[in-house]
Swiss-Prot record:
One of its GO terms (biological process) is protoporphyrinogen IX biosynthetic process from glutamate. Catalyzes the decarboxylation of four acetate groups of uroporphyrinogen-III to yield coproporphyrinogen-III. It catalyses: uroporphyrinogen III + 4 H(+) = coproporphyrinogen III + 4 CO2. This is Uroporphyrinogen decarboxylase. InterPro entries: UROD/MetE-like_sf (IPR038071), Uroporphyrinogen_deCO2ase_HemE (IPR006361), Uroporphyrinogen_deCOase (IPR000257). The record marks 77 as: Transition state stabilizer. Substrate binds at residues 27-31, 77, 154, 209, 327.
Amino acid sequence: MSELKNDRYLRALLRQPVDVTPVWMMRQAGRYLPEYKATRAVAGDFMSLCKNAELACEVTLQPLRRYALDAAILFSDILTIPDAMGLGLYFETGEGPRFSSPVTCRADVEKLPIPDPEQELGYVMNAVRTIRKNLNGEVPLIGFSGSPWTLATYMVEGGSSKAFTKLKKMMYAEPQTLHLMLDKLADSVTLYLNAQIRAGAQSVMIFDTWGGVLTGRDYLEFSLNYMHKIVDGLLRENDGRRVPVTLFTKGGGQWLEAMAATGCDALGLDWTTDLADARRRVGDRVALQGNMDPSMLYASPARIEQEVAGILEGYGHGNGHVFNLGHGIHQDVPPEHAGAFVEAVHRLSRPYHLG
């Protein structure tokens, strides 16, 4: 594969020296870009876009043409694994993802298969290979998966939820059933991410979107425990380079020490966690990614620049910081504001990396 021209994202994840702080945005390929909307219209619907390697590649590359981003992220969805398990993923207009056959009892869990990433999820690997080829070594490609706990929330609730009552009922009334399910999901995610790495992903990220709804004890038992298992099973080197692993629990700022102890390389932070405090707590063990509030991109470019300056100052001098939003970019953000954000990160971070 072609030589990597810009590796500052990978270097920052491994806490190695960089010239400026690298930056990318969660959901950087998305509905805030008019060219994304046009490509999605060609595909017909969201999953058709994910399953067409050429179109998935096109939307992955679109933000890189506009902005000097330091990484590309695979265009896909966290729910590909439950879909491949036969739960019947579909999207309701205005409702988000739904499953036609949610998991309701132990028998449902027992019959869940562990998908073969090169068969049932082969379309994802085709997208990874196509994107990696078309990136031509410009920037690294990030692969990703949802965490077992987060996947379980959708599989048991049948879609998005605010209170997670069905899953929490299973967790408290039938913990062994949930553990069996999470174990299968951890095995599935490990196979899936390793297949992405073999197909060309140069870094991987585990999105634990809903870990923050748990108590501390339950988070360790039902979420972090299974992410730790995945980290232990991942390929950590490919193509002669370390493959960094980032864990991101939204609302998980109180558990950073435990997360860092999993052996991952970096932690994603949402905007509710103070970056300076996070660095004091775990910065000698892992890199940190984040953490501007995505809603800040509605502000003027001057206000965005001010916020970027404050976050850079919070992290301070030295290595080990990847700038990002604290969650995905909103769909109605002006594209030029995202551009002002990326430009400000590079320009304002340079003094923090001198000497």
